[in-house]
């Protein structure tokens, strides 16, 4: 396999590069579930998973992940009979479960890999050049599953035949976080290794309200509201083997003069996405004045304090109207694009933001990273508005058509925000760059469409 799947291992260093590769991974899973219901009031569910992955070390390829949940439908109890006229449903829920994660891990990160040594030697016996070979990464036979244990308690209610309410509290503890740690060389062959070390806690509440506000013959009005709050804390980054005080993240690579500058820190006691840098006290004579001689400090966080969703649905005779939107509150966004495009020294060869050209900022050290560029990223986006009209059935019966509805939809109609960049809704998929607006995103389009729904 080493020969046939690694053609580059046999190349002569004096010739053009030749390369090939082959990789495979295997996942084996066993799953069992048991459900029990008594009198349609008491419900119990238990599951267990046993997963094995070839990605992990020889000592920890398998992981066991149990879960259990229970519910009590209180509204079915005899003592609730007098209240059923206004409490149609009342259910308490509780659960605990463990899940495993192997995403983001290469197929052979735990193994000792062999490869070319980056050089060649001349073999006098065969009168030819030959490749050198060696170990290409630090093996870790103890690499194992990253696991998350979640506890949740919730309640479901349906009141007055009009109001739906769901409330959940949760606590999620993630253990054995996977991260590439710096290690001494020697005794290790290389200066980094992928290992399980960190612990992370998320806890929060979620509330969902649904209401039938008006229910008349010709006019109805339904409303739905969701609210969520999450608090995240990094509990541990080090153990007895792998040590680190903090992890710098939020790279500003690519910004003029900032190739080695980071805007965030991952540190115990703080959430992911914590901005870290100097505090700007103001601008004097066109120069930034930084507190404490420009010493870095905690500046805020990219994670929202509150997320929300809101929707309304109306009907009036044969017309219908749907409106939906969502928003976030309390998060910070680093306007990296503004930092770069506000560099007045680029003039007149490059186009910069006009507001900075007129601001009087002339600091020759620009761009300077500080909380001057850190903005409130709170926003509310009107996601969608749809207006429809359904033709009366009496007009369709002679054409063999059951239903014909015309509609017009507008999406991303406006955003309410104080953010000065392109869009406050920056990506959070890359945890190393949460809340960074580098201006390299494709703007969310505003779209309009018309159409019809036809059924026979």
Q: Language-model features: where?
A:
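Flexible glycine-rich, low-complexity coil/linker segments exposed to the extracellular/periplasmic environment
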Residues: 1-21, 118-138, 250-299, 348-373
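Short aromatic-centered micro-motifs
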Residues: 36, 274, 282, 312-314
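Glycine-rich, aromatic-lined ligand/substrate-binding cores of catalytic
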Residues: 302-334
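Compositionally biased, intrinsically disordered/low-complexity regions enriched for serine, proline
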Residues: 268, 301, 345, 421, ...
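Long amphipathic alpha-helical scaffold regions
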Residues: 66-74, 342-353
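Short edge-strand/loop segments of extracellular domains
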Residues: 89-91, 228, 329-333, 339-344
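Extracellular/periplasmic, surface-exposed regions of secreted and cell-surface proteins
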Residues: 1-256, 309, 317, 327, ...
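Short acidic/glycine-rich loop or secondary-structure boundary segments that cap or lie
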Residues: 233-235, 285-287, 291, 330-334
């Amino acid at each position: 396999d080493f020969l046939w799947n690694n053609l580059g291992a046999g190349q002569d260093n004096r010739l053009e590069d030749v390369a090939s590769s082959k990789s495979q991974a295997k996942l084996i899973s066993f799953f069992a579930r048991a459900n029990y219901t008594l009198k349609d009031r008491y419900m119990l569910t238990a599951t267990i998973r046993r997963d094995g992955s070839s990605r992990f070390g020889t000592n920890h390829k398998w992981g066991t992940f149990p879960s259990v949940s229970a519910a009590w439908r209180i509204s079915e109890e005899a003592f609730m009979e007098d209240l059923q006229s206004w409490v149609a449903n009342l259910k308490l829920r509780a659960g605990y479960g463990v899940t495993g994660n192997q995403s983001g891990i290469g197929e052979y990160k735990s193994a000792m890999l062999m490869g070319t040594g980056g050089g060649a030697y001349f073999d006098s016996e065969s009168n030819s050049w030959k490749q050198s070979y060696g170990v290409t990464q630090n093996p870790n036979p103890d690499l194992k599953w990253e696991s998350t244990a979640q506890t949740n308690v919730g309640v479901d209610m349906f009141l007055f035949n009009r109001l739906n309410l769901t409330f959940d509290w949760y606590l999620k503890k993630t253990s054995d976080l996977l991260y590439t740690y710096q290690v001494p060389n020697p005794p290790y062959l290389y200066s980094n290794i992928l290992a399980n070390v960190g612990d992370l806690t998320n806890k929060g509440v979620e509330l969902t309200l649904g209401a039938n506000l008006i229910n008349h013959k010709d006019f109805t009005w339904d409303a739905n509201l969701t609210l969520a709050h999450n608090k995240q804390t990094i509990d541990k980054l080090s153990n007895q083997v792998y040590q680190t005080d903090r992890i710098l993240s939020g790279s500003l690579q690519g910004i003029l003069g900032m190739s080695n500058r980071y805007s965030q820190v991952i540190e115990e006691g703080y959430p992911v996405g914590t901005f870290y840098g100097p505090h700007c006290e103001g601008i004097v004579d066109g120069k930034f004045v930084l507190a404490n001689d420009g010493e870095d400090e905690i500046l805020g966080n990219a994670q929202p304090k509150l997320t929300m969703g809101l929707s309304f649905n109306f009907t009036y005779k044969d017309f219908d109207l749907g409106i939906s939107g969502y928003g976030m509150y309390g998060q910070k966004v680093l306007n990296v694009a503004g930092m770069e495009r506000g560099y007045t020294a680029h003039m007149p060869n490059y186009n910069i933001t006009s507001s900075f050209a007129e601001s009087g900022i002339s600091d020759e050290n620009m761009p300077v990273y500080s909380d001057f560029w850190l903005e409130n990223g709170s926003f509310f986006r009107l996601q969608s508005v749809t207006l429809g009209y359904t033709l009366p059935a009496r007009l369709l019966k002679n054409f063999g058509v059951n239903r014909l509805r015309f509609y017009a939809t507008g999406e991303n109609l406006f955003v309410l925000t104080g953010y000065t960049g392109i869009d406050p809704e920056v990506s959070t998929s890359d945890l190393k760059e949460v809340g960074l607006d580098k201006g390299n995103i494709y703007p969310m389009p505003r779209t309009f469409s018309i159409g019809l729904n036809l059924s026979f």
